[in-house]
């Protein structure tokens, strides 16, 4: 659905890539999930667009804390309309 890579999408993805390249190495690998939260955010935004993908990524980041065991948590598939 949102695979057209609009300008807002490109800006957000560029910000995430910047985080992955420059900030994440300084913080170390702390994500409790697979894929990492930043990889999840990139995939969700590419799949669903900035609004819905950003919402999914925000919910995921809020779950990434020491009280959560983490584990495998892929981006949900696009639901096909009937």
From Swiss-Prot:
Main subcellular location: membrane
Family according to the record: Belongs to the UPF0161 family.
Statement: the UniProt record of this protein carries the keyword Amino-acid biosynthesis: no
UniProt source species: Colwellia psychrerythraea (strain 34H / ATCC BAA-681)
Membrane-protein topology: Peripheral membrane protein
Pfam families on file: YidD (PF01809)
Domain of life: Bacteria
Phylogenetic lineage: Bacteria, Pseudomonadati, Pseudomonadota, Gammaproteobacteria, Alteromonadales
Record function comment: Could be involved in insertion of integral membrane proteins into the membrane.
GO cellular component, one term: plasma membrane
Entry annotated with the keyword Ribonucleoprotein: no
Subcellular location: Cell inner membrane
Record-given protein name: Putative membrane protein insertion efficiency factor
Sorted UniProt keywords: Cell inner membrane, Cell membrane, Membrane
């Amino acid at each position: 659905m949102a695979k057209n890579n609009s300008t807002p999408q490109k800006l957000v993805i560029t910000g995430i890539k910047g985080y992955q390249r420059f900030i994440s190495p300084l913080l170390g690998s702390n994500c409790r999930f697979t894929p990492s939260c930043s990889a999840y955010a990139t995939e969700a935004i590419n799949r669903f667009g900035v609004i819905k993908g950003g919402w999914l990524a925000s919910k995921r980041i809020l779950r990434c804390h020491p009280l959560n065991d983490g584990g495998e948590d892929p981006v949900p598939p696009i639901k096909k309309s009937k």
